[in-house]
Regions:
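Flexible, low-complexity linker/loop segments at domain and module junctions
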Residues: 1-8, 95-98, 293-299, 330, ...
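ACP-dependent fatty acid/polyketide chain-elongation machinery
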Residues: 1-67, 89, 247-257, 354-368, ...
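Conserved small-residue
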Residues: 10, 28, 82, 103, ...
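Condensing-enzyme catalytic core mediating Claisen C-C bond formation in acyl metabolism
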Residues: 5-9, 36, 216-293, 302, ...
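Acyl-CoA/ACP chain-elongation machinery
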Residues: 39, 184-230, 263-277, 307-314, ...
Length: 420
């Protein structure tokens, strides 16, 4: 059977850089950092005291106050991003065939704040017997965001959550892409969400020595591909891409941001947290996405890398790019928007996919900030264009987004300019 073409017709985002796609994209191009001291809890006894929090968000602008209390923060962010995306795509919900519209969101951890609150409450009152909130489980579980999005809009199509740590929302986008091109849906609200800036979240990642502890200079802590990088910066947020079958989009006169043309998955099969030192899984997943898209390395103008600012991960990803792209690696732009957003965990792929879509649409590459000229790692080839510190204008025919998760999960998607 001939596969259907899939385009992006709507965007939504709630990030540490802004509470919608426009604010987020503008801040990216300006090279702003979302990092600041943590405000959600007392960090006195924590080694990492800063993160990239979502700021100045009035949840009740989107969700009824009573309903919002029944949702973990990650679900609130997911729902807000989806509301933005559905509005942006301009679909007439009164006329839409809601049986052909689905929801696939990626979530890496889920309701960790809810878990903390309920278990903490139980620990204080366990002598009186269990007294759990009836919303404890529905608030906590990782699949519930997709459910709430479908309930909000009455979408009866495919509905589920993908969980593959930091690759979760890229897997969601890739899965939604396949469902549409196989004819199983006309439109899918896809993306991801995460809200793990909690005592357990920050404490757990700190115990793994995964987080930066540059507490005296949070804004400059996330510095991918610099020698002085010392770990990632926790972030939170959500991103939404409305994926739609091309003819369906054209029939309703939808605006088209870009075309999604390929996706790939692979496994490192190496270590539960560390990436393969030679970038094996990263190489495989990028090749899989290129093959799926029918593209060659020289067709890619921009790679939004996983680039978390960790000592091992950044090096292995660069190795994979050089191995696979060869001479073409030195002609394209590379950047890590995590230098600005922090690491959004399960939401990272969705927000970074949005950055790729907007790069393709606008012919501009957001920067990798916080690099200093003399801060070079001898294992990294600086002949590559990492788009350090300043956005760069160039033609972007196609953009590739990498995400890699604990467990060795790798996912990749490719967007290109839409043409008839």
């Amino acid at each position: 059977m001939e596969l259907k073409r899939v385009v992006v017709t709507g965007l939504g985002a709630v990030t540490p850089l802004g509470n919608n796609p426009e604010e987020t994209w503008k801040a990216m191009l300006e090279g702003k950092s979302g990092a600041a001291p943590i405000t959600y809890f007392d960090t006195t006894n924590f080694k990492a005291k800063f993160a990239c929090e979502v700021k100045n968000l009035n949840v009740n602008d989107y969700i009824d106050r009573k309903e919002a209390r029944k949702l973990d923060r990650y679900t609130q962010l997911a729902l807000i991003s989806a509301i933005q995306g559905v509005e942006d795509c301009g679909i007439d919900l009164e006329k839409a065939d809601k049986n052909r519209i689905g929801v696939v969101y990626g979530v890496g951890i889920g309701g960790i704040k809810t878990f903390e609150e309920e278990i903490g409450y139980y620990a204080l009152h366990k002598e009186d017997g269990p007294k759990f909130n009836p919303f404890f489980i529905p608030k906590m579980i990782a699949d519930i965001a997709s459910g709430h999005i479908s309930i909000r809009f009455g979408f009866h199509g495919p509905n589920f959550t993908t969980t593959s740590a930091c690759a979760s929302s890229t897997n969601a986008i890739g899965t939604a892409f396949n469902l549409i091109r196989l004819g199983k849906a006309d439109m899918i609200v896809s993306g991801g969400a995460e809200a793990a800036i909690t005592e357990a979240g920050v404490g757990g990642f700190t115990a793994m020595h995964a987080l930066s502890t540059r507490n005296d200079d949070p804004e400059h802590a996330s510095r991918p591909f610099s020698a002085s990088r010392d770990g990632f910066v926790m972030g939170e947020g959500a991103g939404c891409l409305i994926l739609e079958e091309l003819e369906h989009a054209k029939a309703r006169g939808a605006k088209i941001y870009a075309e999604l043309v390929g996706e790939g998955e692979s496994a490192d099969a190496h270590h539960i947290t560390a990436s393969h030192p030679e970038g094996l899984g990263a190489n495989l997943v990028m090749q899989a996405a290129l093959d799926d898209a029918g593209l060659k390395p020289e067709d890619i103008d921009y790679i939004n890398v996983h680039g978390t600012s960790t000592p091992v991960g950044d090096v292995s990803e660069v190795k994979a790019i050089v191995q696979l792209f060869g001479d073409s690696a030195y002609k394209l732009n590379i950047s890590s928007t995590k230098s600005m957003t922090g690491h959004l965990l399960g939401a990272a792929g969705a927000v970074e996919a949005m950055a790729c879509v907007l790069s393709v649409q606008n012919n501009i590459i957001p920067p990798t900030i916080n690099h200093e000229e003399d801060d070079k790692d001898e294992e990294i080839d600086y002949n590559l264009n990492f788009t350090f510190n300043k956005a760069q204008k160039r033609e972007v025919r196609a953009a590739l987004s990498n995400t890699f998760g604990f467990g060795g999960h790798n996912a990749c998607v490719i967007f290109k300019k839409y043409a008839e």
